[in-house]
A protein has these predicted regions:
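Conserved small/polar residues in nucleotide/adenosyl-binding loops
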Residues: 176-179
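N-terminal beta-loop-helix "entrance" segment that forms/cooperates
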Residues: 7-25
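Mobile beta-alpha loop/short-helix "lid" or hinge segments that flank ligand
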Residues: 5-12, 103-123
């Protein structure tokens, strides 16, 4: 288990340049490329964020956009979990926002007894949220169980069969109408 803080780092957002498809990593050579190597080796990923305006920390979103877009290893059956912390509101929207990275990547999402949120504004305040702390303990047990179960399933049955992706673009690629 390793804890990596990204919210206070200088991480650029994705510019959709496509270099990651050519070189296998993001054109911006920063901690995102290092995280991709660690993520590839991991069985699971927990992403946590404070809630700002019913959304996750912007630096974290830039990191996740680039991490998930530029890393081309198979994320299928790596377990994901998101955890959010707010003074009051916005937890559900932020929780949903973070889980989208997992679900679009074929990653099972670990759940708890409630949405994975805890409340507090200042450091230490979340210690007073008894239900939130219980939710986190339950999440840890459930995620551990899910990772172990998936590992046993891989050994006994292998991974589910996959199909080649069938991408759909709702906008025609022809730009001749602009000339």
């Amino acid at each position: 288990t390793e804890i990596i803080l990204v919210g206070n780092k200088d991480i650029r957002g994705c510019i959709a340049c496509g270099t990651c498809y050519e070189k296998g990593k993001c054109v911006f050579n920063d901690m995102v490329n290092e995280l991709a190597l660690k993520f590839e080796e991991a069985d699971g990923l927990v992403v946590a964020s404070p809630v700002y305006y019913a959304s996750a920390n912007a630096t974290l979103i830039a990191c996740l956009d680039r991490l998930f877009y530029s890393s081309h290893f198979d994320k299928t059956m790596k377990v994901g979990a998101s955890v959010v912390c707010a003074r009051r509101g916005g937890c559900s929207a932020t929780f949903d926002e973070l889980n989208k990275y997992f679900t679009i990547s074929g990653m099972p999402v670990a759940s708890s007894q409630y949405w994975n949120s805890i409340h507090g504004r200042m450091p230490g305040e979340s210690e007073q949220d008894g239900e939130g702390k219980q939710t986190m303990r339950t999440l840890a047990r459930n995620m551990t169980f899910l990772m172990k179960s998936i590992q046993l399933g891989k050994e006994k049955f292998g991974l589910p069969e996959t199909e080649p992706k069938t991408p759909t673009n709702f906008i025609p690629v022809s730009y001749t109408h602009l000339t």
